[in-house]
Amino acid sequence: MLAVAYWLHLKMLAASAFDGFFQVVWPLFFATSAFLLYRQSEDPKALVYAGLGSSVMGIWSVIATTASSLLQRERWTGTLELLVVAPTRFALVLVPITTAMATLGLYSLVATLVWGRLLFGITVPVEDPLLFVLSIVVSIFSIALIGFLLSVVVVRYRTAWALGNLLEYPGWLVCGFLVPLAFFPPWVTWIAYALPPTWGMQAIRAAAAGGSPWFDVLMCLGLGLVYGALGTVLSETVLRSARRNATLSLT
C-alpha cells in the first residue's frame, strides 16, 4: 500500500510543470551563486565541495517549502477531511507523499551536477558509486521523514507555507551543504548533528571521496526514524485535538 501511494504521488508530482520548473530551474540560481563564490578560491576541492552541497540543497528546499504546506493544500482542495477519516493511519497517508516530494529532488541533484560540469567544468569524482547511491537514498528518506514531521507540526497554522520557507536557508547553512560546520560556533554544531541531512551530506561526501560512509549513513537513517516516530505520535495528537474542537478546516 505504501509503495502504491508513493508511486502514485511521484507520478503526479513528476507530471506537474510547476514542480518540474521548481525542482530543476530554481535551485540552479543558488547553485550558480555558490559556484561563482567558490571558484574564487581556485581550489578544485572547494568546487567539488560546492558541487555536492548544491546538488543536495534542492532536496532540502523541496521538503522545507512544499511539505510545510502539504496539508494546507489538501485543506484548500477539500480533501483533508477525506484523508483524516480514511481507515488507514494518517501517518501512513503522509509519509508516501513527503517521500515522493523528496525523491523529486533528484531532478535538482542531477541538474545541478550537470550544470556545474557544463558551465563551470566541475567534475565530481565518485570513488564508490554503490555507497554514493546508498547515501543519497538514505538521505532522501530521512529528509522525507523530516518533511512528514514538519507537515504535521504546522497543520494548525494558516501560514504554514511561510513557516516552511523560513527553514530553507538556515537548513542550507546548518546542515553543512555549502559552509563547513567548523566555521560555526559549537552550539550550532550541536543543532546540526541533531538533523539527518547533516549526516547524509557527510555520507555522500565520504562515499564520493572513497571513504567509509557507514557511520554517517546509520546516523542519518536513525535520526530520520526518530523524526518519523515523533511525527506519528504528533499526528495522532493533532487529529484528536482537531476532532474534539472541530478545527480541522480552520474555518
Model regions and ranges:
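Hydrophobic transmembrane alpha-helices and immediately adjacent juxtamembrane helices
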Residues: 1-251
